[in-house]
Amino acid sequence: MRVLAAMSGGVDSAVAAARAAEAGHDVTGIHLALSRNPQSYRSGARGCCTIEDSNDARRAADVIGIPFYVWDLSDRFHEDVVEDFMAEYAAGRTPNPCLRCNEKIKFAAVLDRALGLGFDAVATGHYARLVAGADGLVEMHRAVDHGKDQSYVLGVLDQGQLRHSLFPLGGSTKDEVRREAAERGLLVADKPDSHDICFIADGDNAGWLREKLGDRAPHHEGTIVDDDTGEVLGRHEGSYGFTIGQRKGLRIGRPAPDGRPRFVLDIEPVSGTVTVGPHERLAVHRLRGIRPRWCGTVPDRLSGTVQLRAHGEEHRAVLVRDGDEVDIELLEPAYGIAPGQAAVLYDGSRVVGSATISATDRVAAR
């Protein structure tokens, strides 16, 4: 089988490419150039967009003994991921750019191009497992290493994409992968994992948004108000710098009368008003999801679990499909859930699909 191995310059994608080659596949490595200005990223930045990362990927391909190329998808990435990220925050929502990248870039633009060039599959270093289902469908399950499981950010993939995907690391732990990399002589064996949003080099999301959005945001400045009294507690430089559940960086002039910390409860991008209050008012019992993406069979109703953050806990939930939208009832409350986040649905370890949260039903305890 002809396999295109996406190599970020990190240890996971390098070992995934090596395993694909060792399995007898005809493997070609590629590095995705996603930044329009990679020189702006400092050496050692914990992302995958630096020139250093590209060089690390090339050296790994040389060690493995596979051809290697760089594909420039920077314009497509900027349009589909970066611009979407800015627009979502400007609208008061909290997007996950990693899911967007998987949906629009790695398993769409890259996969489509790979298939057009005669490749049979794309291999990545994601931690997830693919197994053959009894109904002939390809099922995606959580990885063996639950601490590194990345099935959440892959919950946007459908059958057409899963059938042409390989995740060679799904049955391994991270420690095993690092040991194997060292044994194979891969210089990235001890390279730190990337955690930050790859196109925000210093990790300062609010500062980056302020610089990039500028006057494009509906309200550059606004007020921070108390949920109980409506009193103005402070001002801010842009509602796009906040997310639901945020506690730090509010810069409120005085503490609450009861001394408890305040959290962001609501963001109104049109007026620029950010409402804050106690933690218990973040409790969410019901979600509305739009743009569902199904990994296989489309359920009308499902009792399973839902994950609401990339490394968040699972919540027992009941899903009811309503046309092109879904209603998700949480059997226990979740806290700090924001519109724009992804709700990824599971039946045991199997990924059922995902939806973008459009609304939440908060039960305000007063």
UniProtKB/Swiss-Prot annotation:
EC number: 2.8.1.13
One Pfam family it belongs to: tRNA_Me_trans_M
Keywords: ATP-binding, Cytoplasm, Disulfide bond, Nucleotide-binding, RNA-binding, Transferase, tRNA processing, tRNA-binding
GO cellular component: cytoplasm
Catalytic reaction(s) noted: S-sulfanyl-L-cysteinyl-[protein] + uridine(34) in tRNA + AH2 + ATP = 2-thiouridine(34) in tRNA + L-cysteinyl-[protein] + A + AMP + diphosphate + H(+)
Domain of life: Bacteria
Localization in the cell: Cytoplasm
Main location: cytoplasm
UniProt-annotated site: Interaction with tRNA, residues: 126, 341
Catalytic residues in the record: 101 (nucleophile), 198 (cysteine persulfide intermediate)
Keyword rRNA processing: no
Renumbered residue ranges of the record's region Interaction with tRNA: 148-150
Binding site for ATP: 6-13, 32, 125
GO BP annotation list: tRNA wobble position uridine thiolation
Record's keyword annotation contains tRNA-binding: yes
Disulfide bonds: 101-198
Gene Ontology MF terms in the entry: ATP binding; tRNA binding; tRNA-uridine 2-sulfurtransferase activity
Family assignment from sequence similarity: Belongs to the MnmA/TRMU family.
NCBIfam families associated with the record: PRK00143.1, trmU
Record function comment: Catalyzes the 2-thiolation of uridine at the wobble position (U34) of tRNA, leading to the formation of s(2)U34.
Name of the protein described by the UniProt record: tRNA-specific 2-thiouridylase MnmA
Organism of derivation: Nocardioides sp. (strain ATCC BAA-499 / JS614)
